[in-house]
């Protein structure tokens, strides 16, 4: 809690939000607070912030993540940084507080303040841009602490072949949509099948994941740690046994007339084909369901997929909720959409049953090779002396083989064939899936999923653009710098 007295002698009390950092006052303590715009390096020039609280504005969707201005303040000797959302997140109300993973060291302390409170505080700054405040705070990161993923099963006819359903149970604030409704839906689906006495062909594993929002200190990759630990450390043997993961995020939220499923490339055809054959569901999305690939890094299905388990998630990030209510105290039942929630119960219950009936995991690798081909900058490859024509031919041939394999899988599954040969074939398919994840999946500095050569291609484009700008009759240094900004995270190097 932050306290201060304004110019008229009126006392104010502001509730702050916390990040995963260390800051303990052990009772009320007085500090000087200073406002420094966006908190970039330039705004610290000729300003002494040692031992002070630094107030900054931030837009994490369009500019930079919280760790950049926080570490800048820490490096300048500030006691802590207080971030105010001026765009991007928490835009539902000027009273909104926002929380995100810190993606940095816990020693660089940070808090959040509502826009409304920040405006009141800024109005009381003196001629030096400072104000004396009192802060009573206790924020502590405890290292090497255990948390627990919670598992349950509906035993199938086969115990060695599984389907996973997952949702994370940790949350910021009350977390109604993110992700309590998802855990409830997962349990609701389990309850419905148990009540009807349904025995699946495969064992269904229901996993409430911990530490999705945050779970490891001193790392840029500090989210989805519970899921990562589950599939890499606790149950690495699931890869090769689990034929699919249905991960759920914010399922009681409606993002308009068109719903979405986001999955790995290899399951895109299966979901598209299955959706066409489903019976009419409760009305919620008049434009139907769009299947997209690949999966993204924002949810646990990514951690599950890179372990070798094909995964999907209900599309949850398309609407305005992410900029308004997401990760704020306003994530409550106010945004609850019963029609969407019922629809998702029905949809994923039916998809679960359909996947369960497949004799062989319906993986189609053709989309992977098609997208890999499309991601190649042919002209750039030719100029660099790469054998791009041979590579494209090889990718094309492999795509054709993958289509033939999928057609065979489709026929086997339609016929309901179940044999030892099917098991052997599926074992190979899941190994190929794991290999495809290892060989084809890479991340940009912004954590977008790309093919391995794409980051280098993009950097080369920007380098060439910078060179062209400098080789002009009148060299354009500004244009060259703008091109260099786009290489990796270079833009931040100019800001912090």
Where are these regions (language model features)?
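A conserved hydrophobic secondary-structure block that centers on an alpha-helix together
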Residues: 38-93, 159
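Active-site-adjacent substrate-binding region
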Residues: 242, 250-370, 438
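Acidic/histidine-rich catalytic neighborhood of metal-dependent amide-processing enzymes
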Residues: 61-62, 66, 72, 146-149, ...
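Charged, amphipathic alpha-helical linkers/stalks
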Residues: 334-418
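C-terminal amphipathic alpha-helical interaction region
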Residues: 422-496
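Noncatalytic luminal/extracellular "stalk/propeptide" segments of secretory-pathway proteins
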Residues: 1-50
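Acidic/His- and Gly-rich active-site-bordering loop/insert found
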Residues: 114, 146-170, 175
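Protein/peptide-recognition domains central to ubiquitin and immune signaling
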Residues: 1-10, 83, 90-98
């Amino acid at each position: 809690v932050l306290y201060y007295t304004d110019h008229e002698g009126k006392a104010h009390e502001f509730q702050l939000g916390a990040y995963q950092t260390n800051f303990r006052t052990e009772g009320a303590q007085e500090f000087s607070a200073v406002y420094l715009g966006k908190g970039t390096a330039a705004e610290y020039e000729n300003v002494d912030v040692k031992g002070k609280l630094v107030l900054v504005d931030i837009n994490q969707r369009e500019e930079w993540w919280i760790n950049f201005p926080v570490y800048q303040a820490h490096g300048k000797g500030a006691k802590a940084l207080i971030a105010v959302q001026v765009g991007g997140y928490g835009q539902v109300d000027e009273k909104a507080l926002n929380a995100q993973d810190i993606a940095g060291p816990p020693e660089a302390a940070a808090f959040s303040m509502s826009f409304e409170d920040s405006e009141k505080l800024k109005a009381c700054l003196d001629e030096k841009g400072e104000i004396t405040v009192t802060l009573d705070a206790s924020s502590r990161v405890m290292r090497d602490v255990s948390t627990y993923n919670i598992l349950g099963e509906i035993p199938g006819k086969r115990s060695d072949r599984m389907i996973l359903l997952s949702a994370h149970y940790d949350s910021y604030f009350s977390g109604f949509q993110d992700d309590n409704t998802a855990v409830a839906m997962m349990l609701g689906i389990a309850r419905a099948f148990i009540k009807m006495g349904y025995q699946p062909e495969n064992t269904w594993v229901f996993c409430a994941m911990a530490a999705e929002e945050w779970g490891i200190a001193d790392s840029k990759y500090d989210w989805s740690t519970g899921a990562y630990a589950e599939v890499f450390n606790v149950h690495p043997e699931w890869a090769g046994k689990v034929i699919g993961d249905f991960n759920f995020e914010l399922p009681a939220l409606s993002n308009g007339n068109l719903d979405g499923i986001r999955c790995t490339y290899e399951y895109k055809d299966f979901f598209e084909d299955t959706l066409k054959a489903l019976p009419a569901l409760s009305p919620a999305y008049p434009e139907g369901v769009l299947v997209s690939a690949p999966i993204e890094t924002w949810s646990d299905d990514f951690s599950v997929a890179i372990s070798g388990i094909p995964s999907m998630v209900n599309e949850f990030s398309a609407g305005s909720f992410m900029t308004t209510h997401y990760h704020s105290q306003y994530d409550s039942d106010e945004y609850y959409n019963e029609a969407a929630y019922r629809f998702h119960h029905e949809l994923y219950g039916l998809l679960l049953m359909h996947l369960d009936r497949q004799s062989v995991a319906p993986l189609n690798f053709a989309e992977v090779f098609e997208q890999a081909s499309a991601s190649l900058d042919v002209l750039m490859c030719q100029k660099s002396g790469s054998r791009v024509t041979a590579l494209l031919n090889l990718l094309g041939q492999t795509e054709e083989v993958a289509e033939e394999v999928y057609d065979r899988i489709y026929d086997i599954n339609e016929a309901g064939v179940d044999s030892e040969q099917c098991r052997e074939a599926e074992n190979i398919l899941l190994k190929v899936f794991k290999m495809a994840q290892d060989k084809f999946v890479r991340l940009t500095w912004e954590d977008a999923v790309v093919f391995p050569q794409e980051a280098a291609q993009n950097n080369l484009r920007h380098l060439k653009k910078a060179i062209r700008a400098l080789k002009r009759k009148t060299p354009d240094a500004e244009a060259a710098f703008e091109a260099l900004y786009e290489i990796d995270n270079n833009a931040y190097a100019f800001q912090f």
